């Protein structure tokens, strides 16, 4: 259990995960092949959390700031053979029973959840996504679509690349954006992916030939 996810793991019926490097899977190949090799392990995590793999929602992740509505928006088949919502770098939903996932290897991933409702989200916020304030956009979409109050949200930033291993401190910018969006409960893993390769994949340190960590959020309907 990652300590930085603890604030989210206190929410009943919410499930979260962050799958780090899988040591026995060689990933010094191109992205699609690395993801193919990691897929059985990632699928097992989704199912271990109580979700059907047929209810697994992913974003295409194009380093932008568009947000998809999981369970509503249409999907396409990605290069790795699994469905994604095209053109988006974030997913939000209020539907229970869906598993949302984002892949990262230095970029930031942001978990969002409202303990007073079933509203949740997962965002890919690297240099470009942070510049475009994907977090602020996600909060506005939650307000518009679900009536979410920003002050009720819990936001968590996972491990990501940070100075001195990267010249842009986008983690600090994300913290500022959370405050500006009205988020009062913000938590940062304060961990650099490039400084701990036994635990994390790092696109920069491994020159692009590496795997991806998988972040997950979803809500299990009460029995």
Predicted regions and their residues:
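Active-site microenvironment for binding and transforming phosphate-containing groups
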Residues: 1-223
């Amino acid at each position: 259990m990652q300590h930085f996810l603890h604030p989210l793991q206190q929410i009943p019926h919410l499930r979260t995960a962050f799958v780090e490097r899988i040591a026995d899977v060689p990933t010094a190949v191109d992205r699609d092949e690395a993801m193919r090799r990691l897929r059985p392990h990632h699928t097992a995590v989704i199912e271990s959390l109580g979700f059907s793999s047929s209810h697994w929602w992913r974003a295409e992740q194009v380093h932008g700031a568009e947000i998809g509505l999981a369970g509503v928006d249409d999907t396409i088949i990605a290069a790795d053979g699994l469905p994604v919502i095209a053109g988006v770098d974030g997913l939000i939903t209020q539907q229970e029973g869906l598993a949302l996932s984002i892949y990262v290897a230095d970029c930031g991933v942001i978990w969002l959840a409202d303990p007073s409702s079933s509203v949740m989200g997962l965002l890919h916020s690297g240099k470009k996504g942070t510049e475009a304030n994907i977090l602020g956009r996600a909060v506005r979409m939650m307000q518009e679509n679900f009536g979410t109050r920003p002050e009720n949200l819990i936001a968590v930033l996972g491990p990501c690349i940070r100075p001195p291993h990267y010249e842009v401190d986008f983690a600090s910018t994300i913290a500022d954006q959370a405050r500006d969006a009205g988020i009062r409960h913000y938590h940062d893993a304060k961990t650099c992916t490039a400084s701990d390769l036994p635990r994390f994949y790092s696109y920069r340190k491994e020159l692009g030939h590496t795997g991806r960590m998988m972040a997950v959020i979803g809500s299990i309907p009460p029995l």
